[in-house]
Amino acid sequence: MRIAVVSAPRHRGIPEYIKSLAKGMEAMGHRVDILDAWTEDGMRLPGYEYIAVCAESVSFWGGKIPDILGKVLGAGSGLVGKKSAAFIKKTGPLFITKALWNVMKAMEKEGMKVNWSEIILNPAHAEALGKRIGA
């Protein structure tokens, strides 16, 4: 399966847990591309069979996600009905489920079907989650 992992961390760059998530998916025989939300425009997203969105909360208390995520998903026309997964990196003790809900809300706004959501604890956990995609 051809999978896009959209990385929307708090700061620019690809964090280790996203690389581990992609590594787990590749171990299951999938073709995986990591798209950085800070540098990509989202136009390539319709070409993938499955889209995994990984984000981090930008605030410690509020569950707010990076604004760039909505822009990237909005630019990728043709996402209606696309199977997808939502992941959020656990960054604090509170409101992490609200941040995950906000990621899923942004995805569903574009018509994507979110069939899996999870909170990532660390890179090893992310790799284990990646091995469950398509299984």
Task: Label the predicted regions.
Residues V6, G13-A135:
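FMN-binding flavodoxin-like domain, especially the glycine-rich phosphate-binding loop
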Residues M1-A4:
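Extreme N-terminal starter segment of soluble prokaryotic enzymes
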